[in-house]
């Protein structure tokens, strides 16, 4: 069963993944009030986030990669680091290959015995960054209004693009918090300006 938020009213419902759909469903005039960043700004922010995650992972002690990110979540630092970049790969599978986007698509874990060092995970990031750069350079319609198939219906590519960007950013913020817990100062941390315009959760561990 998919773990997906749903807003229901009688026998009607809407998936909670698209907050504008939710706002319309409940009759909120003017929607959420959030204006997504233009696609040409998102690519720069996303690539900066991924490069920041690479720096953080290269700082992470390899001997601690299998520790939990936080005590009450069953995800190791290794899996979190891999996930930051897997989000980008999953996005491309939908945007380029036409695979239906689903939550589990971005949660495909690395095989046992792989990605055992921060450096190895960071190098995986190199391949994802290169693919994203190539995708953007070759994208014919940079408005990103073309529709893609997701588990919550056909959606504009722009929505999934923005979602994937802030999703990577949120986990990168969490990696910085892990470094700080280890008394390691994050290398060139993300700034408020880097994250401006992204609809990030208010709390770090949401």
What are these regions (language model features)?
Residues 3, 8-33:
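Non-catalytic, surface beta->alpha helical segment in thiol-disulfide oxidoreductase systems
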Residues 66-111, 147-206:
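Short, contiguous alpha-helical
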Residues 46-57, 112-148, 155-174:
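Acidic/histidine-rich alpha-helical segments that form the ligand environment
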Residues 21-24, 28-91:
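Non-globular targeting/processing and membrane-anchoring segments
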């Amino acid at each position: 069963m998919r773990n997906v938020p749903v807003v229901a009213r009688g026998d009607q419902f809407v998936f909670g993944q698209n907050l504008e759909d939710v706002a319309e469903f409940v009759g909120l005039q003017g929607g959420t009030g959030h204006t997504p960043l233009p696609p040409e700004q998102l690519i720069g922010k996303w690539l900066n986030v991924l490069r920041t995650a690479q720096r953080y992972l290269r700082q992470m002690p390899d001997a601690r990669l299998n520790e939990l990110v936080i005590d009450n979540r069953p995800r190791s630092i290794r899996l979190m680091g891999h996930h930051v970049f897997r989000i980008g790969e999953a996005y491309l599978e939908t945007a380029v290959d036409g695979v239906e986007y689903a939550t589990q698509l971005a949660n495909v874990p690395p095989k046992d015995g792989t990605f055992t060092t921060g450096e190895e995970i960071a190098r995986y990031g190199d391949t994802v960054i290169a693919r994203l750069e190539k995708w953007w350079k070759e994208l014919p319609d940079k408005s990103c209004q073309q529709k893609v198939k997701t588990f919550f219906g056909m959606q504009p590519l722009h929505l999934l693009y923005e979602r994937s960007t802030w999703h990577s950013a949120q986990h990168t913020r969490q990696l910085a918090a892990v470094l700080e817990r280890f008394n390691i100062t994050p290398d060139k941390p993300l700034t408020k300006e880097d994250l401006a315009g992204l609809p990030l959760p208010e709390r770090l561990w949401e």
